Every structure is written in structure tokens, then in C-alpha cells.
Amino acid sequence: MEIKRFGRIREVIPLPPLTEIQVESYKKALQADVPPEKRENVGIQAAFKETFPIEEGDKGKGGLVLDFLEYRIGDPPFSQDECREKDLTYQAPLYARLQLIHKDTGLIKEDEVFLGHLPLMTEDGSFIINGADRVIVSQIHRSPGVYFTPDPARPGRYIASIIPLPKRGPWIDLEVEASGVVTMKVNKRKFPLVLLLRVLGYDQETLVRELSAYGDLVQGLLDEAVLAMRPEEAMVRLFTLLRPGDPPKKDKALAYLFGLLADPKRYDLGEAGRYKAEEKLGVGLSGRTLVRFEDGEFKDEVFLPTLRYLFALTAGVPGHEVDDIDHLGNRRIRTVGELMADQFRVGLARLARGVRERMVMGSPDTLTPAKLVNSRPLEAALREFFSRSQLSQFKDETNPLSSLRHKRRISALGPGGLTRERAGFDVRDVHRTHYGRICPVETPEGANIGLITSLAAYARVDALGFIRTPYRRVKNGVVTEEVVYMTASEEDRYTIAQANTPLEGDRIATDRVVARRRGEPVIVAPEEVEFMDVSPKQVFSLNTNLIPFLEHDDANRALMGSNMQTQAVPLIRAQAPVVMTGLEERVVRDSLAALYAEEDGEVVKVDGTRIAVRYEDGRLVEHPLRRYARSNQGTAFDQRPRVRVGQRVKKGDLLADGPASEEGFLALGQNVLVAIMPFDGYNFEDAIVISEELLKRDFYTSIHIERYEIEARDTKLGPERITRDIPHLSEAALRDLDEEGIVRIGAEVKPGDILVGRTSFKGEQEPSPEERLLRSIFGEKARDVKDTSLRVPPGEGGIVVGRLRLRRGDPGVELKPGVREVVRVFVAQKRKLQVGDKLANRHGNKGVVAKILPVEDMPHLPDGTPVDVILNPLGVPSRMNLGQILETHLGLAGYFLGQRYISPVFDGATEPEIKELLAEAFNLYFGKRQGEGFGVDKREKEVLARAEKLGLVSPGKSPEEQLKELFDLGKVVLYDGRTGEPFEGPIVVGQMFIMKLYHMVEDKMHARSTGPYSLITQQPLGGKAQFGGQRFGEMEVWALEAYGAAHTLQEMLTIKSDDIEGRNAAYQAIIKGEDVPEPSVPESFRVLVKELQALALDVQTLDEKDNPVDIFEGLASKR
């Protein structure tokens, strides 16, 4: 099929790798393939360097030191597929070469020590933890550094905050009090800053000289009594203020202050904090602490420059300004590598504590590095992070786009971050610095709005964690090929033009240019422009960039369209959209859902399970295909060959399509012929009418695979057994089980059918003499077992497509304590579209299928072509998502011309271009009509006459010309399939791309007749998972009261709910065909009485004659 490209803006640079934020970050943290001597001081290398050397405490017997030399990462013991199958973690062993040094004897023992396992990242950027694919979401937080903010309590005053890395030191606030005294607040204690400045060696003369420009403010800082002290005295005085309970000793004070401000192991601004502090204060720092300790004295790094800036800000000196904490120059991303390294550091600190204890306890002569180190604390810390952290999430694998989006998510929640309840509007809002860095459209709709966002398409995260976006350099009005990646802070210094600025060659073509400076729009001469956007795509995330004509959609609906694409279910007959945006191929390629050729070569073998290619370098590579694998969300992951034997392939050519891809293009739904018109109220309120033909052609059929699992345990009564020998079951019920009691592959199973047979021993009383006799004759066989088999849950079923049996003792199998074996059965369902399923397009138009019409009843074109879907026109104006109408018009042209289109966002097809294509399509369509011998009939002319009155067509023109005018508007005359008559007015018809979403009615439909009850309230449980009932709430009670339906209401509140005795009596009566008796007391009333009695209130129930009634009488025996 021919692909026609729109778009006038040349792509200067390709998109960066889409999973780079995950893959590169983790690679850098591990540095597994870097020789030890060339490793940078980042990630786990930095964690080792910070923790080691570990020295024996003061109380030690002789001085022992454990030092670190290098580490290496071994090979993973199991493949990724084995890990998924056996519920293992995809990980590799970590070894460290350590030295134990005896200080007094100089003896050195060296050893390679096993430090546990380190989870490895798969090539697509996710992890396999306990058999499940997981993603570590990047976290955005306030960067460490020095910040100046207005004091909310006192206008015109400011607070300077010095913020370290999370959990790597205290926050420090400096402020000028109302009295003029400059105070410092640390660990919730406030003291005059001059005290610390004296400890740092400043005297009155120096302070006056350094701060002479701020006369009045300096007077509030100076305290002659303090400045007359020696630094050591000031240090002890400061220590007594910070630790009032501790004895004021010089050595204690020194150790405390060193740990608080100068110890690199306990206080750390981080590289990003150091960079931000230097940038803000205009000074160079020697390290990442606030104070350095040299020759027994403290030397200031940060405090005086911070104070100078605070004074300048208070005095209103130009060039000094407060910080915007939501500016992306002040917020940074903590990627997976940093998050893991932080946790690794925590684990190493616990390990070091254990090492110190063993140094003290053990004999120095017999100790070795291996005896000192216990790897458990480190492994536990990593396990905790990967399996339980708020940022470690179950991977969304609904379709390839979902998994890619999940890896590019940025969350402000999580440890050290915000909470939903505390986050205000400012932090959630779109900020001007989001431009090209964080998508302004894609974010969840609920409580997490604005807290969870997505990385923009071209954005990259730099080594310090700041998000950079690319710009082309402009010199004297000429756009160069030089591309510069800039942080938000750097961008604020320049004037930047938009990507769609008109160019003649490389020169800006207009004499005035719309540009922006610090986020504000300005109109400037071409010579003033310093940079230019690389592409309109750079503003939005991947999902949003997949919406054609995005510029015509309201942002609220674009948000829904972005989010709903990730909920699209892969269909068995996937179709790429007729109207694309140009990113569809790249998404499939970077998600690794499809298979591509590694080099140039020739295909030598193709079958349903593998593709073999002989590459030109002589290698014969077999590429295995994943067929009908279950994704985390239960959708089918299936790869289908797209090459033939003997076919020549080039490097990067498509070998096999993955789920939701067609010829390597993302294919989340189907292109269907849509009419936008009301239809007898069946499409009221976003409901959708579809043609039965879609079901016949399997257009919206998807495969879903459910996983069922059962364990056989060792119990106190005896072991549970997986067996076919189940008591009290007919042979018919067991017909699909093999001799081991597991259902065969290919069997069709329905609700209640047995998947895995299991028997468990019954709990029993003391056996009777007769039973004991039988047991002695027949052995243990007579002991009673009960059927505890795994059955298909209500409302589920399908075809058994896989089974797996894991036994304790099998290689690589790790089962929970007490579990002897686990059996898993995979059941696949082929789901056709049905009434109640949710459909949506890319523009945020979503609805539920309300009616499936026979194809003969669907509206049809004059040539008899029936439409596939009828959408309500009222779904468009109020939602303001007109992009879908333009897509439909362009789709109509594509339908007749047999073309596909690429229309990039903010640079797509214009109205004149669409009209031109529609004119071409009309000539083809009408020429075909005339060729088949039918022109414009009488009924069509009536519709045209009405259209003329509405001003849709020009009066006085021939019917053919009027039809062409309508076609230029994307409208045609449509006939009612039920009556054969045309509808009154012309109707918009065209191809629209519509997806079936994960919210399928089959998963939500639920009915209960008899089921489980809650133990305390004796009311039916709630929800489909518990096989619960429908809640009859207070509003439903009001409805029955309003109707006066007293008996129905009484039944609802008693025997249908929690009246145990009444329930049983009613059951008996129905069986015997008698009248249902009067209800008794509901259990919830008894619970209420008991709760009141528990509050020491005397509650009595009386009859009409005030005689006491015991509502608990005989209850124990009846239960």
C-alpha cells in the first residue's frame, strides 16, 4: 500500500533510543563490562568506595581494616525464559575482592568474597523478579543545592535553604529574624549563625569587610561576645545548643560538627547539588560537603556566599532572585541506576555493621575476609527494593506501546518524594520548563494527575539527572546543523524560535520571528534568534505523538486518547492506521516486540517457531519466535514470520511481526468505515452501533490467556496429592484429566470443570471401633480425603494451551516452605467483540458497544458498501476533539485511493491538502459508479435539494458537481439499510482508526445465586473476585420505600441479606413447595446490639407488651 507523507519540517536528528533512560542508567550503575581500573566513581563502585575501608572500632583487639579492591559480576545461572517459568529472579552473582589488613603486624589477607545476587536488566529495560516482569519507574524530586524562597510569614524577607541528597544530611535554613538577628535552623534547633561563622574562623573584621555593602543587615549578624571567643570555645557553645543533654567536651563537639557538616560519608550534596550550589552562588566548591576539615580546623565552603546572596536578595540588589521550586532546572530525575545504587549503599552499610561486630568478636589470627562478610543484609536490601518499593511496578504489557510508556514514566511519588494528599496544584501543574522535557498532555486522570508524567519524545536525562532537550543553533539568522542538548536553566539564557519557523534553505525567511525567551512569547528579528526547536514532536510524549491532527484536539481529550492507546488489546488481525503520525514504526522497533535482521543475509528456514538467517559474515542464526505467550495483563504475546525462505534481508529489516504490529508498524486497532450520525437512540450518550460483519471478519477478535495455579502442601493431617483419583466424581467429570490428574492440552473447559485434581485429608475426630477395624484391614485407604481440586472459576473458561508442573527438588525450583509441588494451567479464550465492550479512537472519543446490527440493516453508500460503525455526532462539539473528523475525512480519501498517510503532529495535512485528495478520491469513486451504469437517482437529488437549502452545496450546479462539493466536505448521501431510503441529510463518512480497550464486558459480567457469606455480618461478600452479591445500599432502600414495596424491601433486608434462620427456613420452604415463612432477626442487628453492649450500654429488646425478648436464644446450637 502506498504511503504518502505530509509535513514540511525536515527531521534534523532521529529520536534517541526510547528505552535509554532505563538501559543506559542501569548499565552505568553496574559498569559490568568496564575493566575494574577504568570504572568511574558512580553506581555500585561509588557505594563500595564510600563504605570501605571498614575499620575495627576503638574497643578492638589490634587494628583490623577490611578494604575493597574491585568487584566483578558473574554470569546469570538461568535464562530469562527459565526465570519466568520457574518464578525465579533474573540475576547474576556479585563477587568482591577484599583485603584484610592487620595494622599492628602488617599482615594482609586477600580473598574474593561472594556478596549475593544482583538483578540484571533485560535488553528491553525491565527486570524479572520472582518470575514476573517489572519496571522501575524513574523518580523526579527537588535537586539538592542552595535555594532562596520568600518567607510566607513575612513579606520582603527570604529563607535560604541548603538541601542535601535524601537521607544524606540535615536540611539547613538561614533567615533574618524580625529583630535583625541572622539565625540558622538545623535538626529543628535554631541558633545565631554568627556562632557557626566563628567556629569556621571568621572574625568581626573579615565579616564586616566581606559584607560591607549590606550595612544594616550586617549589624544584626554581628555579636561581639561571640566574635571575641576562640573558635574552640564557639564550637563547644554551639554543641551545647545543638545537643543540650550531652557533656560539653571539645572532642565530642568536634566529632559531632564533623559528622553534621564535613564528613563526606554522612553529608553529601551529590554532584547535582554541588553543581547547583556553584551555579547559584558563583563560587567553586572543593567537595560535596558544606565545610571542609583541614589541619584540625573547619573551613567554610558555602555559608558566607549563601549569606551574601541572602543579604543581596533582602536588599533588592539586581541580578539576585528567588528560586521557583517547580522549575525543571531545580528538579532532577533519579533513574533506576541511582535508585538501585542507593539501596545497594544501604545494604552495604548493614553489611559493614556486621563486619565490625565480627572483628571485635573473632580472633584476629583466624579471621579472613570471607569469614567477616555475611552477604544476607545486602541481598535483603536489594530484594526489598526490587519486589516491594513503590517505584518497582508490575510491568504493563497490554501492548508494545504500554510497556514502552511504562519505562518512560516519571513519578513524583515514592520514597523521599511527595504523597498524593500533600501535593498541591503548583507541583502538579504544567510548567513552562516542561517544554520538550515532560509531556504537557499525558498524565493520569485521577488522584495522580500531574504527579505521574511521561518523558517527551526527544528528551534525555544527563549524568546529573537533569532533563535535556535538543535545539539547533542559529547564527545571524542562519540555522546550522549543530544540535545542542540543554537543561531548563541553560535554556533560560537564550531566545528560541519554533520548529515551524519558515526557512529559505537554511536562512530564516521572515523579517519578524515568533520566538520565546524564558517561556514568554516574543517577536524578534532573525538575527536575535539563538536557537530553534528541532521538531514539533519534541514537546510531547510517545503516546501523544501518535495522535494525528493533535493540534485540533482539546487537551483534555488528547490526554484520554494518549492514555487509552496503552489500554488497546492486541487483535488477531492487527491493522496499522490509515492515518499515521510517523512514530508507529519506531515504537515497535524500540519495544523489541518484533524481530529484525542483525546484519545483511538470507533467510534459510521459516516455520511457526523459528526463523533461521544466514548472515553475510557466515553465521547461521536461529531466531526463536514467542508464540502465544501470556503477558502480565493476560493478553497474548505472539510473533508471526514476515519473510520467506530464500528472501534477502538487509540489516534492520523486519523478520517477524509482534503483537499489535503490522509490517513493523504499530497496529493497536482497526481501520473501519464510520458514519457519524444518530441512529434511533442506540448511540445515545457515547454508545456505539457496530455491524455484525466486524465479528464475521474477526476484526476485533483478541486472544486472552489466563493462568490458574494450585499448590500441594504438607499439612498436619497429611500431604495433599495431585491425583486423578478424586472421591465422589463421575468419569465424565474426569474425562479431560490425564493419569496424573492434570487437564490435557487442547481440552475445552467451562466454569466448574476440573483443571487439576487434588485431594486433601479431612480433619477427623477419634475414629469409632468399627472404623479402626476397617483401617486395620484395608490400611490407610479408608481414611477420608476430600476433593480440593482446582476448578475453572465462574464466568471463565476456554481452551487449555499450556501446563507446567514444578516439584520440590527439581533443578532451579524454589517453592515456599511446606509446598511440595505447584501445577499451573494456562487457558486461552478467543474473544469476539460483544455488546458492552469498550471502543475508543486516538482522540479521546470512547464508548461502549450498544448494538450489533446485521450487515443488511447498516446504513450504506449509494454503491451498496455498508458502514462498519455508527458514532453519535453529539460526541464531537462539546468535547472539542475535531482531530477525529479530519482523520475521518483523510481516511475517506485513503479508502478510495488505497493509500496510507503520515501526518505528523503540528506539521500534518492541511485542509487544502485533504480537499485535494478528496477531489481525487471522488473522481475515482464517481467514475466507478458511472462505469457501472448508475448516475444520480431521484432520491439522491432530494437530499441534494435539502443540502442546498442548508447552504452545504452551491445552487444551480449539476447533481454531479453538488455531490462533489459534498464529498469535498467529507459528506456523502447515505441509505438506510432497513428501508432502502436515503437519510434526510448528507452524512460524514470515512475511515477511522478504532481500538478495542482492555475493559471487556466478559471480565466484568457477574451474577450470583448462592455464594459465600461474611463470617461476622453474615451478609454476602462483595465483588466478582469473591463471587459476591450486588450491594443493596441506602439509596436502593429509598427507591423501594418510595414505591411502597414493603415485602420486597423486607426480603432484601433479611433473608436475601443476613437473616441466617430466615434464609434456611425460606430454602426449606421453597424445596417443599410451601409458603416462605416470616423472617427472623437480621445478624447485623445482633452485631449492633453486641457492639453497644461492648460499650457497657444495657440494650434490651422488648415485644409489644414490653416483655423482654432474647434475640440470641439458641444461636450457638444452630450455628
Swiss-Prot record:
Pfam families: RNA_pol_Rpb2_1, RNA_pol_Rpb2_2, RNA_pol_Rpb2_3, RNA_pol_Rpb2_45, RNA_pol_Rpb2_6, RNA_pol_Rpb2_7. The RNAP catalytic core consists of 2 alpha, 1 beta, 1 beta' and 1 omega subunit. When a sigma factor is associated with the core the holoenzyme is formed, which can initiate transcription. CDD domains: RNA_pol_B_RPB2 (cd00653). Belongs to the RNA polymerase beta chain family. HAMAP family: RNApol_bact_RpoB (MF_01321). It catalyses: RNA(n) + a ribonucleoside 5'-triphosphate = RNA(n+1) + diphosphate. It is an enzyme of class 2 (transferase). GO terms for cellular component: DNA-directed RNA polymerase complex. The keyword Aminoacyl-tRNA synthetase does not apply. One of its GO terms (biological process) is DNA-templated transcription. The gene is rpoB. DNA-dependent RNA polymerase catalyzes the transcription of DNA into RNA using the four ribonucleoside triphosphates as substrates. This is DNA-directed RNA polymerase subunit beta. GO terms for molecular function: DNA binding; DNA-directed RNA polymerase activity; ribonucleoside binding. Keywords: DNA-directed RNA polymerase, Nucleotidyltransferase, Transcription, Transferase.
